[in-house]
Amino acid sequence: MSVRVKVCGVTRLSDAVAAWEAGVDALGLNFYPKSPRYLDLPTAAALARTRPPLGTVLGVFVNAAPDTIRETVRACGLTAVQLHGDEPPEACSGYGVPVIKALRVTGPEDVVRARTYVGVGDVAGLLLDGAAPGYGGGGVGFDWSLVAGLAGSGVPVLVAGGLRPSNVAEAVRATRPYGVDVASGVESAPGIKDVEAVRAFVRAAKSINLWE
């Protein structure tokens, strides 16, 4: 079995199509207004329509109002929600789709905090990211050994932060995650994906057999 790959911050139709063709399992569409990868609803809906039958399209939100999230899920046909802000456990349900809760990691205390989301509401997975300024997409990594703190939690874990084609295989070997997530590590500019880098990232990530 190989790791799942999510490419976040897609803004162009051609990049979305190329990512699916490269073997990506999920795309993240950014609805955080302060992000350089922010999308309006018509653009996001068009990108979501590129989804193949077994693909996942997540909407990425930062401290957004629940009604805004629900409206966006309906308008764009999202299949999951990623909460990437300071949302408490009680905010992780009520959107009609599974929730991935992202948490910035600087030390063991953040992994302890991550465990408070396990089994709560509609949380279907946890995404551990580096603590870059702002919320995500900063290309900052974290100590991969901390992922072991979620061993036995029963919740799928995705690793993000500072990943790129040259180090993602190492990250998969070190953490044995359910998935890996990349944004800036496969870009030529914020929101502009380098298709060759996406292909190389997918090849490297999926070259590791998680059952070995």
Curated annotation (Swiss-Prot):
HAMAP family: PRAI
GO molecular function: phosphoribosylanthranilate isomerase activity
Enzyme class of the recorded protein, top EC level: isomerase
Phylogenetic classification of the source organism: Bacteria, Pseudomonadati, Myxococcota, Myxococcia, Myxococcales
EC number(s) recorded for this UniProt protein: 5.3.1.24
Keyword Amino-acid biosynthesis belongs to the record: yes
Pathway(s) served: Amino-acid biosynthesis; L-tryptophan biosynthesis; L-tryptophan from chorismate: step 3/5
Keywords: Amino-acid biosynthesis, Aromatic amino acid biosynthesis, Isomerase, Tryptophan biosynthesis
Pfam families: PRAI (PF00697)
UniProt-listed InterPro entries: Aldolase_TIM (IPR013785), PRAI_dom (IPR001240), RibuloseP-bd_barrel (IPR011060), TrpF_fam (IPR044643)
GO annotation (BP), single: L-tryptophan biosynthetic process
Name of the protein: N-(5'-phosphoribosyl)anthranilate isomerase
Disulfide bonds: none
